[in-house]
Amino acid sequence: MVYSDTKTSKKIKKYKINIMKKKLNIFQIPLKGIHLIEASAGTGKTSTIAFLYLRLLLGLEKNKENIRKLSVKEILVVTFTNAAKEELYIRIKKSIKELHLSCIKKKSKDPIFQSFLTKIKNFDEAIHILEDAKININNAAIYTIHGFCQDVLENNTLISNREIIENESFLYLQATQDFWRYFFYNLPKKIIKIIYEEYRSPEDLLREIKPILKVNSSINFKKKFDKKETLITFHEKIINKINIFKQKWLNYNLIILKIINQLKVNKKIYSNFNILKWKKKITEWAESETKNYKMPICLKYFSETSIEKNIKNYNFKKHIFFEEIDKILKKNFSLKNIILFYAIKNIPKFVKREKEKKLLLGFNDLLKILLKNIKKEESLREIIIKQYPVALIDEFQDTNIQQYQIFNTLYKNKKTALFLVGDPKQSIYSFRGADIFSYLHAKFKIKNYYYLDTNWRSSKNICKAINYLFSKNKNPFYFKNIPFEPILSSSKNLNMKFKIKEKNQTAISFFFQKKEEVNIEEYRDWIAKQCANEISYWLTCSKKGEAIISDGSQERILTEKDIVILVRNRTEAQIIKESLKKVNILSKYSSPYESVFKTFDALELLSILKSILDPTDINLLKKSILTHILNKIAFQKIKENSKTKISHFLIQKLYEYNDKWKTIGIFYTIKTMILEYQKYANNFEMYKNQQRNINFLHIAELLQEKSQNCYKENSLMRWFEKKILEKNNISENEYIKNFAESKIIRIITIHKSKGLEYPIVWIPFIVDFNVSKSYFYHEKKTLKIFFDNNKSSETLKKSDEERLAEDLRFLYVALTRSIYHCSIGISYLVKKRKKNKKSSDIHKSSLGYIIQNGKCMNYKELLYELKILNKKLYIEVKYQAMNCKSLTIKKDDLYILSQPQFLLKEIKLYSQITSFTKIKQENKHFNNIQYNNIESYFFKEKDKKKTIHNFPHGNKAGIFIHYILKTIKFNNTFNIDWFYTILKKYEFSEKWAKTLMFWINNILNFKINNLNITLSSLKKTQYIKELEFFLPIKNTLYCEDLNQIIQSIDLISSISQKIFFNPVIGILKGFIDLVFIFNKKYYILDYKCNYLGNNDNCYSSKNIKKEIIKNRYDIQYQLYTLALHQYLKKKVKQYHYKTHFGGVFYLFLRGINVKDSIFYILPDYLLIKKLTKLILQKK
């Protein structure tokens, strides 16, 4: 879509008068007013922001000595992603540190810092300011856009008791389902059948409109419907039009058949037989009842268009009905228009209603609320400006209209400063809501316009090649308003070279598939092979010392870590991975900002470490044995000694690791495991798993570091679990230390590569494209967003123009990642083969548009353009990669460890156990379970009288009893054979069967306090077993806050010692053994299999109370109550705690023969309210 209309051109010319485009001098730009800084790729955008930040800290204004110096809390820095926020924080922190050191030394090797020194008049003051900034950098106002909005709104109490949600997908699905029910359920069946042909489910409808619903600006419709227009009335209108046409057919068909018979038509198509057959079909349709909008396919042969194509004499006698047929065939009758109109109008309303009902806010709601309030409240604007007199907005090209309006409204005052830094050529995030048109709109309103013109990243020839490619076309980014300015190369990069066998390689190599009419599958296979072969050739040369990278001052040999392949998605990545695999090159598809805690290795290590902390927990043992490390060690033990019992061996091994952990620390414990694994692994396994070992050791380092501040091992595991669950907040030291640094080729999406740089880049699939199927576009004159629910071909064309424009920006981002060299694939690509097709489709792709100047070209014309490119010293066109043998990997053993080598047949396990709270676990000493107890689990028991008191105690026994109570039906009678089976399954002696049967029977018939009920009397509809819950900890939970609340209200807590744990935030997960309803009240019942002594008298109220205090079961019942309270609020109409919640029972199962073996408490409502506020309500 090119802005060529008169009104827009005049508007742009008007703005151009006001815009003074200047090259940026970091020390000359005023620190007041609104400034736009356009920074092309590699020109130092992040450094520019950091240097402006330093100027603001020191108050270095041109010719002004009295400008106020700002603190780190007063300089607002806003970007759009957490990764960018982290990068800015690191760069600003580093710059403060470097300038501080330079001020102390009064000299610097860096020319920028040296320039700062010449402008500082009072070094003592500057050192003090920078030292203060270093100390307070953690309080710097560096935000994502949504983080900034949330902070302002919460600090000014404009939102309260609202949960902020990042992902609103579930709300939109629910709203679409509500819309579906509201609009469709009461329709006649005949209309529902027609709708079903368009959309089979609410999910289908949501899939089509989701891109439109993501747009923050208001949407305009090409066709609007009157409020009185319903699906029924619209349907009836369509049916009426079809019926009118049917009647016309019955009236005129003989006349038009007579006309056709008189014409010299193509008799191969219009034979008498065909004409009569078509007439019969159409007449039968015309005489039948109209139930849908389908037309007979053969009707097209009677259209004016079809007849004109198939006659020799075009001046045939026309009848008006021929034209009528053409018109009705073009109508494409459908209910989609009206459905989409009402869906787009109403679904956001349903979402809004649901958010208000559930007290939820999405990220975009934060923008809307803040914009609304700052527009109407001058006092709020003043508060924000007073707090942040200067704002630096990073990645401004990724803005949308609301984000721009917020900052424009705040910083219109001349006394403030707003710096907008970005590059419209790199706006590639429309799928996330970024709107390049908002940027263009803002650009035209800003008078102070600066640019950066020196590329500090790439070699001179890379800069030349990119300048040439994007200067070939007058509008290289399709829109006239996004021009391309040739970039200069930094003087330090003038001698950068990539050499193979002492020959300098060109900056860009195009690999062209010399074949006409190539389809996408053929092209993908071919270019993937070329990519793999070329990289194989480079690496082979590298092994011989013949592949060299030189920065002008020193040379080094090319390694795998220097090479990156850029793709669009996982599908393209997989194609490349397979090709690389064929030539024995290892590769990895990953995110550049991926945390080591998000790897599968972190989950495996967590399973192992948990098992080390509790070797007797069979459930943990099951998970840990399925990990690669323990599985290999155990499997090798079987090979060495087939008589070894795996369960015994593993438990002993886990206890060994446990001792090491306590004596030499977690890092060396993990390292010992890896060394033991490597002792049994063959060379190829070790080669294959080097990345995993790097990850394990990396996590071990982080855990060792964290362990210095952790009170207990379980506390460390809680932190470890939290890091695995965290979505954001990734620290730089957590980024994966890729084995790719030495041995693996990285494959990264172009989206994720933005902002990064790589020595050598391959872009194999950039010539591919997907024509837009969206009916969503920006109107040329007003830049308003339109949705064409009429679905015209003109709209599709406009939408595809916008797609191509973004693809061109996508290409620019990909090309500008390279430092020394970039290889690109290209082909004479034909998406859909057509007869007599004289041109390919690549002009519709970004690369084709650039090379062919936006023109349609045939094969010879494309070859000619490539020959012109090939004449440039910095560009080369290749037709095939260098032939090279596959790289060899030494394999002492071809066996590949692809999965655990044996499944536990020996250890029979169940699937679930009751979870204790993690907070309690942090205070539990490991030595509560003694090694001697293991014998009662795995070895033959001595013959003695069987009672419930001497039934094996410990973790395994508790799990076993819980499993029985979870599995059985409360009101059934038992067969002793079942007990024999289950005892055998869990490796207990079958001699316990009779005792166990009586014990379980007594439990089920035990009277629960004053309720006068038993478990066996409960109906199935009265209870839920193993109710799982997840409670989000919205605020960092500190032990001091929890102790203060529970000890001030709860009697048991008040006489218990304070609990200690590290600050936590994340998700609290648990299982409630039993929830039951009686007399309209809901109760929690938790089974306790604790051993208090060898007779019934040991289970007195006094002893039970001591056991509850000792194990801090008070915190358990408080959190369980909180969880059930939240659950019932959603499930019970007009729910209130005091009316509907009955309390908590702890049933001590070994004391079931005495009345006192049950403990009851009803937690105070005030306690639950305070816990809700502390844990669940975002502060």
From Swiss-Prot:
Domain spans labelled UvrD-like helicase ATP-binding: 18-459
Enzyme Commission code(s) on record: 3.1.11.5, 5.6.2.4
A Pfam family of this chain: UvrD-helicase
Active site residues of this protein: D1086
GO MF, one example: ATP binding
Gene Ontology CC annotations of this record: cytosol; exodeoxyribonuclease V complex
Catalytic activity: Exonucleolytic cleavage (in the presence of ATP) in either 5'- to 3'- or 3'- to 5'-direction to yield 5'-phosphooligonucleotides; Couples ATP hydrolysis with the unwinding of duplex DNA by translocating in the 3'-5' direction; ATP + H2O = ADP + phosphate + H(+)
List of residues binding Mg(2+): H962, D1073, D1086
Top-level taxon of the source organism: Bacteria
Cofactor requirements of the protein: Mg(2+)
Free-text comment on the cofactor: Binds 1 Mg(2+) ion per subunit.
CDD domains membership: RecB_C-like (cd22352)
Annotated residues for binding of ATP: A39, S40, A41, G42, T43, G44, K45, T46
Other comments on record: In the RecBCD complex, RecB has a slow 3'-5' helicase, an exonuclease activity and loads RecA onto ssDNA, RecD has a fast 5'-3' helicase activity, while RecC stimulates the ATPase and processivity of the RecB helicase and contributes to recognition of the Chi site.
Family, per entry: Belongs to the helicase family. UvrD subfamily.
Role of this protein: A helicase/nuclease that prepares dsDNA breaks (DSB) for recombinational DNA repair. Binds to DSBs and unwinds DNA via a highly rapid and processive ATP-dependent bidirectional helicase activity. Unwinds dsDNA until it encounters a Chi (crossover hotspot instigator) sequence from the 3' direction. Cuts ssDNA a few nucleotides 3' to the Chi site. The properties and activities of the enzyme are changed at Chi. The Chi-altered holoenzyme produces a long 3'-ssDNA overhang and facilitates RecA-binding to the ssDNA for homologous DNA recombination and repair.
The protein's assembly and partners: Heterotrimer of RecB, RecC and RecD. All subunits contribute to DNA-binding. Interacts with RecA.
Domain comment in the entry: The N-terminal DNA-binding domain is a ssDNA-dependent ATPase and has ATP-dependent 3'-5' helicase function. This domain interacts with RecC.
Protein name listed in UniProt: RecBCD enzyme subunit RecB
Native source species: Buchnera aphidicola subsp. Schizaphis graminum (strain Sg)
